[in-house]
Amino acid sequence: VEYILGANDMYDVVKFKTAADKKTVALQPASRPGAVSETVYVLPYSTQKAASGTHGTISKIDTISNNSFYYTLNMKTGEKTVSCPVMNAEGEVVALIQKNSDKESTSSYAIGIGYAKSLSISALSANDYTLNTIGIKKGLPEDESQALVYLYVSSSNLSKEEYLNLLNEFIQQYPKNSEGYSRRALCYMGYGDDAHYALAEKDLQTMVEVNENKGDAYYNLSKLLYNYVLGLQGAKPYGDWTMERALKEINTALENDKQGLYYQLQGDIYFAMQKYPEAFASYDAVNRSPLASAASFYAAAKTKELIE
């Protein structure tokens, strides 16, 4: 098993991805749901000594959700057939046998294959109790925007190493998404040593390369560097990770797009460098943009006081 793709504890179903060679022939899910009175066959595990199949008919079908069904079967099954596939005459999988609470019952129950197929990892699966108790790592959501939210939610629940592994998987699955590189760079920076800073620098460059919005890319790069230098509190920075570098990157962002948000960061950087006339000019540009606010007017006024 490589990773979990979904689970439901009510119906005791888990969907997961496994590694298989090309010679392995997979069973195909049924193209249509089963029908009442249709003859179906239980395919036993190949590890059983007596691998004789069981057959019976469908006596009842309950709809549990859109295109998902729960079957009552006229056949007796035991513990050794739990989760075994229920096949139709075409050799397709209709359902999976469920555990029967009554060992002597001549009826069996099966969850439709459509329900099992519909299981998935969503943006909020990071906090899913059922998935977390399985003990096998979860896959990422197949939708890219959902996968991003999944990253946000997971960042506060995982250890640094676990989160880094998740970021690696995200980048492997979505190599053109710049958010993955910026988040991994930030994670590397959290280790606080030169080896990880070097990895972070590489990711920051890749973040800029893959982001089609260059203004946004250089803004994010500048913001990361600005926050990093502020956090040093006077300590020696790594390489050229300085306010001067942060200023260079935000200036490049402004060359691409003169957004008020970019001027705001430019002003903050100038202010941190104690270049108050330049900071005032930047804040003044913010105040002439749609981003103008009480905070930006206060920043401009405060900076002007320092000039005088």
Give the role of each language-model region.
Residues 1-40, 48-51, 67:
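Conserved active-site neighborhood of the chymotrypsin/trypsin-like protease fold
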Residues 19-25, 52-121:
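Active-site region of chymotrypsin-like
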Residues 96-162, 166:
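C-terminal cap/linker of serine protease catalytic domains
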Residues 157, 191-194, 228, 240, ...:
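Structural motif corresponding to the intra-repeat A-B loop/turn of tetratricopeptide repeats
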Residues 175, 212, 256-258, 291:
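Short coil turns that delineate tetratricopeptide repeat
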Residues 179, 216, 259-261, 293-295:
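Start-of-helix register in tetratricopeptide repeats
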Residues 186-190, 223, 230, 268, ...:
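Residue-level recognition of tetratricopeptide repeat
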